[in-house]
Structure formats: structure tokens, C-alpha cells
């Protein structure tokens, strides 16, 4: 199983308490350590302000980080979990992604979803249409991404977006395009879009849920005449590991104190626990067909989970 890890960027309050003039260096230090420990990839979220509630604490923007980290790392693949389609025109976004793939030497993962954080939409002046409309917009965006990365003068006219000879040079180094992750677990539409267009899917579920999503994806693949085995099924979840129960309790107490997330939330997560427990659960995911873990490590700034998890690299 491949493993990637998020850098701290503030969205989940992981830069709280870090002085503003030290925040970028903290992000860089985490990226460097992820690379030194032989992780497959680093990841960032695409959000503008903190969760679970908006605060004045910092949140660094997704594609700004992608561009910068493409120049400060050498071998890590670079992903977003996941780009919110609604926040950027898809032709512009494809242009940005193509540039970063070239700038990074062909290391970009292109992960996108329909968007969900309604408070953020409203705060920044974006329309927040129904889920059905957001998913239709996502499908048009996926089509534009594939056209602009593979054709010289692509033309497309949809209900929400259109391009007319949208030149995209330089093309990405990866052919036909950087791997396309269609993210989200919606079983009727999102998994259908994954079956039609995607190279990878990504879900935040327990092992039983992972098996269920996989079975539904296979049904969609059968209907779309898509080879099910072509699609990588991946997991994104919190990972927090400690050597003993007292240390785990202390970590969770600290996290809860500055995120205001109840301690029970952390104890219920499938990959939070002692080393043997977490590694055994990961093995269960692997047996269920998971090929890639994208780990959000909430103690990455101050704890040792990144080091412990790296034993599997």
C-alpha cells in the first residue's frame, strides 16, 4: 500500500499557536520530513478558512502551496484532497495544473470533487447550488480537463462551462494527463463519474464502508463498460498513533483542546490507536482492495505519528 501525508496548512487548525512568520517554514519542514521518510506523496486541502468552525486562524491556499512545494521537493508526488470544482473556472484550473505538472517534473496528482463547505462558498461570494447541479458542473469540468490536456484546440459547450479553442501549452509531462482522482463517496452520481472518468477514487470510511463503496463502484463500472481493476481505490482518514494508552490519551486531549472537536470523535476513527492496532486495521483495508492511504496526521507539527507510520514505507 502506498502512503501519502498532508502537510499542515491550517485548515484543520494544525498551525494554531505557530507564529505567522514561522508558519511557512513549518509547512516546509513537514514537507521535507515527509520526503525524507520516503512517503509516496504529500497532500493539501482546498479550503479558505478553518473547520469545524470559521476562525481567524491561518489557512494556506491549496494551489499556491502546490506551486511552491513543487519547487521545494524533489521526488514526492503532489496532490490535493480535493480541489473544489466550484472555486475555479475549470479551464483556468486545468492550465494551472498543467503548469505545475511541468514545474514539478511530472509529479502532480489531480484530485477534484464537487464541493461541500457551504459556509465557505457564502463567505467568499460563490454561488452554492444544489448538490445535483454541483455534480453536473463537476462532470463538465472533468470533460474539459481531459480535452485541454490532450487536444490542441479543444471545444466544448455544456450547460455550465464552455471552451472554444482553449490552448493549453505547455501540456502536462504525464501522458495523457496527471492521474485524475474523482473524489467523494456519493453512490448514485459521484461513483458513476469515477467509473466514467477517473483513475482513482477516494473515500473516508471504515473497512466495511470501503468494501461497500467498492462493490457499488464495480456495479457502475459494469454499466459504463469500464474495467474495474483500472481504478485505484484509496482511503483518506485521520491517522494518530501512540506507543501506549496514556500517550494516546494525551495526544487526543491536546487535539481536542485546540480544535474543540470532542475527544470521542478521535477515539472512534479507524486509524487512531496504538501501533499494532492501527497497522492491523490498515492490513484489513489492504485486504479489501485499498491501494493507497492518504493520511491526515493531526500531530504532524508536534508529535511522532509521521515517524511511526513511516515504518510501513
Which sequence ranges carry the predicted segments?
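Short, acidic/polar
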Residues: 21-34, 93-96, 184-196, 250-254, ...
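Active-site mouth loops of central-metabolism enzymes
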Residues: 9-25, 83-91, 176-186, 239-240, ...
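An alpha-helical appendage that flanks or caps ligand/catalytic pockets
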Residues: 7, 132-172, 204-291, 300-307
Amino acid at each position: 500500500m502506498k502512503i501519502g501525508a498532508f502537510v499542515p496548512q491550517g485548515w484543520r487548525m494544525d498551525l494554531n499557536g505557530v507564529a505567522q512568520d514561522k508558519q511557512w517554514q513549518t509547512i516546509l519542514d513537514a514537507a521535507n520530513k515527509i520526503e525524507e521518510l520516503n512517503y509516496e506523496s504529500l497532500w493539501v486541502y482546498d479550503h479558505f478558512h478553518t473547520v469545524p468552525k470559521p476562525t481567524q486562524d491561518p489557512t494556506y491556499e491549496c494551489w499556491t502551496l502546490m506551486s511552491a512545494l513543487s519547487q521545494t521537493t524533489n521526488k514526492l508526488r503532489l496532490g490535493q484532497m480535493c480541489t473544489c470544482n466550484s472555486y475555479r473556472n475549470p479551464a483556468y484550473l486545468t492550465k494551472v495544473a498543467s503548469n505545475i505538472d511541468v514545474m514539478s517534473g511530472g509529479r502532480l496528482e489531480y484530485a477534484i470533487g464537487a464541493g461541500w463547505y457551504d459556509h465557505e462558498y457564502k463567505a467568499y461570494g460563490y454561488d452554492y447550488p444544489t448538490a445535483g447541479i454541483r455534480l453536473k458542473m463537476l462532470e463538465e469540468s472533468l470533460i474539459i480537463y481531459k480535452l485541454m490536456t490532450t487536444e490542441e484546440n479543444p471545444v466544448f459547450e455544456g450547460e455550465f462551462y464552455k471552451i472554444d479553442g482553449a490552448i493549453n501549452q505547455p501540456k502536462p509531462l504525464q501522458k495523457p494527463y496527471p492521474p485524475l482522482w474523482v473524489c467523494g463517496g456519493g453512490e448514485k452520481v459521484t461513483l458513476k463519474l469515477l467509473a466514467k472518468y477517473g483513475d482513482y477514487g477516494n473515500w473516508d470510511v471504515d473497512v466495511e464502508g470501503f468494501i461497500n463503496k467498492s462493490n457499488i463502484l464495480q456495479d457502475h463500472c459494469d454499466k459504463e463498460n469500464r474495467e474495474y481493476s483500472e481504478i485505484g481505490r484509496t482511503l483518506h482518514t485521520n491517522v494518530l498513533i501512540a506507543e501506549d494508552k496514556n500517550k494516546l490519551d494525551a495526544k487526543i486531549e491536546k487535539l481536542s483542546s485546540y480544535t474543540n472537536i470532542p475527544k470521542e470523535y478521535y477515539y472512534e476513527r479507524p486509524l487512531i490507536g496504538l501501533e499494532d492496532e492501527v497497522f492491523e486495521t490498515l492490513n484489513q483495508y489492504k485486504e479489501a482492495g485499498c491501494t493507497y492511504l492518504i493520511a491526515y496526521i493531526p500531530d504532524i507539527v508536534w508529535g511522532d505519528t509521521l515517524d511511526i507510520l513511516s515504518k510501513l514505507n
